[in-house]
């Protein structure tokens, strides 16, 4: 390979692993004497894609055209900056005979985009083949709906929204106690058609959703119907489910943004993760009540951002501390203090709507405990009374929480 015809735009940490690969040869012609291939299942792609292992890293390499290689690499980087789940680009490579000659033939050029191989990521099509159950499909559709909602919330038009263009990855996260949990997330794996807009239009949103629905129809046709679990699929129900999950997540993202703008509080910093927009409504209502309380105490109007910080420090954090002291995990399994608090707030919100009046935090805790704890009634009753007694020391008299 004559390196004077090589353009290697690769991140420095990966450069030594990639610079001596056979970039002057079409990817389909690479052989195991030149590189170490990884035997990894891959999804449907219109481009040649190979997975390789170098001394220090594992990569996915896709052969494409020069413009697409550059555009995709830059787009992946921009998506990551916006917090979108997508591939991590290592860079792109061009190889062209007579690179600097004015009349060089375009067909003599080769272009590649290189991304870091995602550990524990699986193409949707493989997961469907393993398990085409209702639960499996809906888990994937929910992850894909959240990905699409995140894109649209950030004014990004996908252009080719499709099951074929996502990877499903199992990722680990930690709660406030450091307890690990595994979540399934969808990662955008092809950014060739991505457009980052100033404002995304309704037409763009509808087009992406329609395109994704078409891919659901296509994947349904791709699988044989001899399996009863596959023949009983209600595609219309699947589409409704996807649309509803998209709507829920898009509304949640807007609700979070509105809450953070109003209160100056960061959801992730204080509450780790909220998946229910009604929890946010309930928390905002508490902050507004705290604002009213502080204004009454001071005799003048208190700013809501000041009230929000006061509420965090003097109401919310002390309550979370009491939850931890009382070992609430013994009574509510698979939870943590922050999640329990937001779940109780959502429960309070629903019950208040149902009864047509604010039921208050004490009634909400009693009701939630009876509904969601598997402890026997006498033990649970003692726990709840002990908790409520401690909360009265935190919450001021005549304070509506």
Task: Report residues per predicted region.
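A short, basic N-terminal segment
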Residues: 2-27
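Catalytic cores of glycan-processing enzymes that make or break glycosidic bonds
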Residues: 236-255, 277, 288, 333, ...
């Amino acid at each position: 390979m004559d390196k004077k015809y090589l353009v290697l735009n690769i991140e420095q940490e990966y450069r030594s692993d990639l610079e001596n690969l056979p970039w002057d040869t079409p990817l389909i012609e690479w052989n195991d004497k030149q590189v170490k291939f990884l035997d990894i299942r891959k999804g449907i792609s219109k481009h040649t894609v190979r997975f390789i292992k170098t001394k220090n890293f594992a990569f996915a390499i896709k052969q494409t055209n020069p413009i697409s290689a550059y555009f995709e690499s830059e787009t992946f980087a921009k998506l990551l900056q916006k917090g979108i789940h997508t591939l991590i680009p290592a860079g792109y490579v061009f190889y062209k005979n007579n690179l600097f000659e004015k009349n060089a033939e375009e067909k003599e050029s080769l272009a590649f985009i290189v991304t870091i191989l995602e550990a524990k990521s699986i193409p949707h099509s493989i997961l469907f083949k393993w398990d085409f159950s209702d639960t499996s499909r809906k888990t994937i559709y929910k992850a894909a709906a959240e990905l699409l909602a995140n894109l649209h919330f950030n004014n990004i038009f996908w252009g080719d929204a499709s099951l074929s263009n996502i990877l499903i990855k199992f990722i680990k996260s930690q709660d406030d106690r450091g307890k690990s949990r595994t979540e399934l997330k969808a990662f955008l794996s092809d950014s060739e058609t991505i457009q980052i807009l100033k404002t995304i239009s309704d037409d763009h949103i509808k087009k992406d959703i329609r395109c994704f629905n078409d891919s659901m129809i296509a994947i349904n046709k791709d699988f044989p119907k001899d399996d009863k679990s596959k023949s009983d699929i209600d595609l219309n129900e699947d589409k409704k489910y996807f649309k509803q999950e998209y709507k829920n997540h898009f509304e949640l993202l807007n609700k979070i943004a509105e809450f953070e703008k109003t209160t100056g509080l960061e959801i992730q910093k204080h509450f780790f993760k909220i998946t229910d927009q009604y929890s946010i409504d309930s928390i905002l209502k508490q902050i507004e009540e705290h604002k009213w309380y502080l204004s009454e105490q001071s005799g003048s109007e208190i700013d809501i951002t000041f009230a929000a910080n006061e509420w965090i420090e003097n109401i919310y954090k002390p309550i979370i501390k009491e939850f931890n002291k009382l070992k609430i995990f013994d009574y509510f399994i698979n939870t943590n203090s922050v999640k329990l608090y937001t779940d109780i707030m959502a429960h309070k919100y629903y019950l208040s709507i149902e009864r047509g009046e604010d039921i208050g935090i004490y009634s909400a805790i009693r009701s939630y405990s009876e509904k969601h704890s598997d402890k026997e009634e006498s033990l649970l009753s003692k726990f709840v009374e002990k908790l409520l007694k401690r909360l009265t020391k935190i919450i001021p008299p005549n304070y509506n929480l």
